[in-house]
Each structure stands twice: as C-alpha cells, then as structure tokens.
C-alpha cells in the first residue's frame, strides 16, 4: 500500500468568468482529487485578485488553495486532468513537508490580520510624481 502524503494545490481560475462557472471549476478540481484517491482536508477560496503579471492576456484571477492527502503516484494523474481544464489559468501542486507546516504555523502566530482579502482588493500603492520608480 502506498503511503499518503499531504499536498497543497493552488489554482488560479479565470477571474473574468461568471461565478457559476468558477464554482463549477472549483467543484471539478475537488472531484478530480477525490476520484484519484485523494482526501481533501481544507479548501481556502481567496477570491478574485489582480495577478502579478498578465496570464494569457488576463490580469484578474480567482485564487484558491486546496489541502489534501494522496499517494505520490496519483499527483501526475491529477496534473494531467488539470492541464486540460480551460477555466484554469495556472495550477501548482506542492508537497507540504513538516518544515513548511512549521513555518506556516510560525507565520500565522506572528502575523496580524488587517482585514479580509475582499477588503484589500485593489489596494495598490503607486509612486507619486516626485518619487523615483
């Protein structure tokens, strides 16, 4: 029997799509993970955000993180299905090691929550005319 490990899948869905299509894409990602033998432990939907750079000429994406446990052999199968999903702009699956989990706990312990992601959406700092870029 294969040992299951903890993974995190981060997806960026096209933010220009309707909410129903985004919800369907999220359901599809979760269904693929479950169908391939994964067990989802948490889902964090961050929401629509401006991307750091244009992806396929699009600058708004819907971000979500899914933590799940699965065998190492099914990760390639999950990626194969996600690769051809048109609504996904990007995806990344990483193995969450004990060092990453410990670092995450320390960051959460010492971080200050300023507001929800929706409250901070679009808050960008621009240099004034007198400042150099």
UniProtKB/Swiss-Prot annotation:
SUPFAM superfamilies on file: Ribosomal protein S6
Any one Gene Ontology molecular-function term assigned to this protein's record: structural constituent of ribosome
Pfam family, one: Ribosomal_S6
Gene3D superfamilies (alphabetical): 3.30.70.60
GO-annotated cellular components: cytoplasm; ribonucleoprotein complex; ribosome
Keyword vocabulary terms for this entry: Ribonucleoprotein, Ribosomal protein, RNA-binding, rRNA-binding
An individual GO BP term: translation
Entries under NCBIfam families matching the protein: S6
Purpose: Binds together with bS18 to 16S ribosomal RNA.
UniProt record similarity statement: Belongs to the bacterial ribosomal protein bS6 family.
UniProt protein name: Small ribosomal subunit protein bS6
Organism per entry: Chlorobium phaeobacteroides (strain DSM 266 / SMG 266 / 2430)
């Amino acid at each position: 029997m294969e040992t299951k490990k903890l993974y995190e899948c981060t997806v960026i869905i096209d933010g220009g799509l309707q909410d129903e299509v985004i919800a369907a894409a999220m359901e599809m990602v979760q269904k693929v993970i479950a169908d391939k033998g994964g067990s989802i432990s948490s889902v964090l939907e961050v929401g629509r955000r401006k991307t750091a750079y244009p992806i396929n000429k699009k600058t708004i994406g819907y971000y979500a993180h899914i933590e799940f446990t699965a065998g190492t052999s099914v990760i390639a199968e999950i990626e194969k299905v996600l690769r051809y999903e048109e609504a996904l702009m990007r995806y990344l699956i990483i193995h969450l090691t004990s060092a990453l989990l410990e670092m995450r706990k320390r960051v959460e312990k010492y971080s200050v929550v300023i507001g929800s992601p929706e409250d901070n959406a679009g808050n960008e700092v621009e240099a004034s005319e007198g400042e150099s870029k």
